[in-house]
Amino acid sequence: MEQNGLTAVIVAGHGSGFSRGYIRYFADVHMWEGDSLILIPLDGEPMHVQVTYASASMPDEMWIKDYRRAPEPQKEIVNAMKEKGLTKGKVGIAGLQKRITVGGYETIKNAFSNVAFVNADRMVDQIRGIKSDLELEQLRSLWEMSQRAMDRFVEVIGPGITQREAASEAARVFRGAGSFTDLTLIEEGRFKGLPRDVPLACDDMVSFHLEICGESGHWSEINVVCAYQEPSELERKLINSEFRALQEVRAKARPGTMLKDLEDTFLQVIVDDGWKLGDPEWHYSFHGQGMDSIERPYFSPMIEGNEDAPLQEGMVFSYHPHRPTIPEVRRVPKIFDGFVITKDGAETLTKDWDFLWRIMK
């Protein structure tokens, strides 16, 4: 803050998978819904305020002692800034781009004619991007639990069991481990979406995608493919190509490497194996992951939406690059991983995980 000439930072959060992480990071409070704001002065104690219905989980020992509830948190921020004499200078807002509400920002800005409010998103994202040893321990535990949930899905699926019944068995694992925020997607045939009360056919391929916000507030993203027909020659070739690309990307992912370099490494392996590349699709090949399911930095093969950056030791990424190929492959590999950047390359957060298809008998 001092280096950036800030007298304070206002941290904004909202109860959703992409925007509650700021609040959890600074206050260890898991938001269910609603809005939350934290005032962190350069000198003095912080203040945290939430709408009354926002809290889902509070720490036994509050990290921020000055904790308030208010139907309009921004008004309490105004009060606290006046109490602390923060009526001039430069104040950063972390979450200005996507987290703070328009009304909240306008109320705070209009209350202080002598304060210059500036975007502090990148400053806070850079701090959060490097995970502590404790966070890495929590992430490894979360990924281990995520794998157990996926294994349970594989154990129970079969012809006739409904999508919801199968997904619920996986949910028993992560609910029992303290996770209450998730995304579960099932893909079979032409259907892809939230589980429905529809029997699985289990005659071709079933894909199960799981994103979990764990007890510590961190996220994981993992996928499993259950194949009821052996891979064709082309499918097996692409599976092998993408698995080799995963290994090459891990080796390349050292401090100083750009995310675009990882994308180029992935694509080069595919091309070297004799594939021609189709048109890119809009998705993130790599994105930071921590207390938000998607965090800076991130890379997309499309120009729009990129936040490319050099890798730093301790960063954590979700890995899921892909590119349509020529010739086209009907069933694609769907390889997902999570890894932490080390000086020796990427260390996977999975443990003895089978990234290849599960061939169901």
Regions found by a protein language model. Give the residues of each.
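Active-site neighborhoods and metal-handling regions in enzymes and metal-associated proteins
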Residues: 1-361
